[in-house]
Amino acid sequence: MASYSVTVSVAGTSINKYPAGSAGFDLAMADSYDPGKQHARRVAAYLPKQQGLIYLPGQQTVLSEDSDQARPFKQRRYFFYVTGVVEPDCHVTYDIAEDKLTLYVPDFDFKRTIWTGPTLGKDEASQRYDVDRVEYFSALEGDVLRWSQANPSLPIYILHPDQRPVTPLTVAYLYESKSLKHAMDACRVIKDEHEIQLIQRANRVSGAAHRSILANLHHFKNEAQIAGLFIDVCLSLRSKGTAYQTIAGSGSNGATLHYTRNNEPLAGRQMVVLDAGAEWSCYASDVTRSFPIPSSVSGGRDWPSREAEQIYAIVQRMQEECISRVKEGTLFFSIHQHAHAIALEELLKLGILRIPQGSTKADLIKAEVTALFFPHGLGHHLGLEVHDVSPDSGTIPVELAIEREKGLMSVTEHRPPCTLSAPPLASGMVITVEPGLYFNRLAIDQARAERDEPNSKGRFVNFDVVERYVDVGGVRIEDDVLVTKDGNKNLTDAPKGKEMLDLIYGR
């Protein structure tokens, strides 16, 4: 694909949105393949009966409260999974026994067409999507009625009890709302090749946006400019936008995990935590980079302080070692524990943590003291949602149960797969690996106030040393990783480490 360069003027300064080294993009490329019906078949195979009707509504147009303006449209992900349809006000049914996928599109509305353009029609939908039949919405009620009358003993599978199709109240329908979500989650957690390509494309857009920010960072005075350029590049590359609210936290704001105000000046601050990911065809990327603010660096150095460099190096080690452990059959919670083990080792070396007289390292583990600085899970599933669905939990593995009983591991659980009962990683899963270390003033002050209590984390903290690191704020590094049979594949190409620093300083 041919690369290209576009420059824009920001606050009187020429900004190159696509610096040298950015991945080229073919903006004319379209995602021509739609696996919706294959997904419907996969879901049906997980249901308790191989007969029945699956019904799913798409996202309907909804007005904001006390307004005539529609809320921003986001397609329901379960509906999208079996249709590939990104238009509002649609519905779908899948007759399992007949292997028949029927899409229902909005009835034609002449007035609406004049104002907003034509809605998705039957002919267009038949050409664009892998469905067997397309009807207008007005046909849905009669179709469901006739199917139910012909199959009175078979279930209509629905996702939630409040997502039933509109049907006559005088007719009894056999709705089943317990099985479909479990079946769809089991399918969604294992990505097929098409889904992997979409996640990788979202990552390519994210990588280009992160690269652009690093190359132009010396121009920026405010967090808003960082967040704004990220969205600018995503939209320019035909992404519909970001998969979640951008986090562009400078200084102490980087110690707030989901900081989204993005409106404070960069002056006088050391680091930025930028957690920002593009979406492509409803699939998410989730990428975090932490980098120095050039105006805070002097004397030919790369880092604003020795403390910032040290914390970045620790988090970099945490991520590299954890990614190397990602493979099929591995328990992700064990990898999460390894990240905490590295944090414990390195924070003891820096003197941030201490082992008081009469205590042992095991006491620090039991107190979960590293959670004061690393308070979140190592990662989560990624797919149609940034925090994507997970498979059903199983029993806690024996080896983890023994370690927990002996006090040899942290027992704090987070979002799956960062739980004791999460099943092992499987080929086709896409997970994030996002270790971080944070110096959150509120958390530190609370630990200091409780340090004399018998079970407190503060007993093991050198607060005088911690004060030297507070201005770092936080450091998080996050990549999206595909689990494979023989290891893993990192889908994220946003610069980090030396490549990141070279871009910032124009080397």
UniProtKB/Swiss-Prot annotation:
Domain of life per record: Eukaryota
PANTHER family: XAA-PRO AMINOPEPTIDASE 3, XAA-PRO AMINOPEPTIDASE AN0832-RELATED
Co-factor requirement: Mn(2+)
Pfam families from the UniProt entry: AMP_N (PF05195), Peptidase_M24 (PF00557)
Gene Ontology annotations of biological process type: proteolysis
Function (record text): Catalyzes the removal of a penultimate prolyl residue from the N-termini of peptides.
Catalytic activity: Release of any N-terminal amino acid, including proline, that is linked to proline, even from a dipeptide or tripeptide
Protein name: Probable Xaa-Pro aminopeptidase ARB_01886
Cofactor comment text: Binds 2 manganese ions per subunit.
InterPro entries found in the cross-reference section: Aminopep_P_N, Creatin/AminoP/Spt16_N, Creatinase/aminopeptidase-like, Pept_M24, Peptidase_M24B_aminopep-P_CS, X-Pro_dipept-like
UniProt keyword list: Aminopeptidase, Hydrolase, Manganese, Metal-binding, Metalloprotease, Protease
SUPFAM superfamilies hit by this protein: Creatinase/aminopeptidase, Creatinase/prolidase N-terminal domain
Binding site for Mn(2+) 1: D286, E434, E478
The enzyme's E.C. designation: 3.4.11.9
GO MF annotation terms: manganese ion binding; metalloaminopeptidase activity
